[in-house]
Amino acid sequence: MELRAFCVILLITFLAVSSQAAKNKKEKGKKGASDCTEWTWGRCIPNSKDCGAGTREGTCKEETRKLKCKIPCNWKKAFGADCKYKFENWGECNATTGQKVRSGTLKKALYNADCQQTVEATKPCSLKTKSKSKGKKGKGKE
């Protein structure tokens, strides 16, 4: 009888301690809630080179926070990594400049970034013209 009572007390103690530990862990995961609503975020600064993982600093009143961010390595540096644009198809090749042009309209500005409403992108004209395939290649009946 004493062994049974001891086991029950031990089990209850174990459950109480583990539930308290879980509660403390949950509270530790929550960061201090801020009453700030008007955050001003800076641009994403990469940790090395000009793309990849980095940090972004934000301020609100006297509070400062840093967030992890990522700059894609194929971004157009002239437009900024926080400005997302919807681009049209490439235009015809301009023989005098040797370039194609397309324009884009602002789709989304992340972190209140200062973005241009419309932008233009250029690329050199390709030297060869691509021929369209004349049919499916592969196995099959002719």
UniProtKB/Swiss-Prot annotation:
GO BP annotations listed: cell differentiation; defense response to bacterium; nervous system development; neuromuscular junction development; positive regulation of cell division; response to bacterium
One GO cellular component term: extracellular region
GO MF annotation terms: growth factor activity; heparan sulfate proteoglycan binding; heparin binding
Gene3D superfamilies linked to this entry: Heparin-binding Growth Factor, Midkine, Chain A- C-terminal Domain, Pleiotrophin/Midkine, N-terminal domain
UniProt-listed Pfam families: PTN_MK_C, PTN_MK_N
Keyword Disulfide bond: yes
Protein's cellular compartments: Secreted
Signal peptide, first to last residue: 1-21
Coiled-coil annotated residue ranges, if any: none
Keyword terms of this UniProt record: Antibiotic, Antimicrobial, Developmental protein, Differentiation, Disulfide bond, Growth factor, Heparin-binding, Mitogen, Secreted, Signal
Disulfide pattern: 36-60, 44-69, 51-73, 83-115, 93-125
Main location: secreted
Record-stated family: Belongs to the pleiotrophin family.
Function recorded in the entry: Secreted protein that functions as a cytokine and growth factor and mediates its signal through cell-surface proteoglycan and non-proteoglycan receptors. Binds cell-surface proteoglycan receptors via their chondroitin sulfate (CS) groups. Thereby regulates many processes like inflammatory response, cell proliferation, cell adhesion, cell growth, cell survival, tissue regeneration, cell differentiation and cell migration. Inhibits mesoderm formation and promotes neural formation during development. Plays a role in development of the neuromuscular junction (NMJ).
Name of the protein in question: Midkine
Organism placement in taxonomy: Eukaryota, Metazoa, Chordata, Craniata, Vertebrata
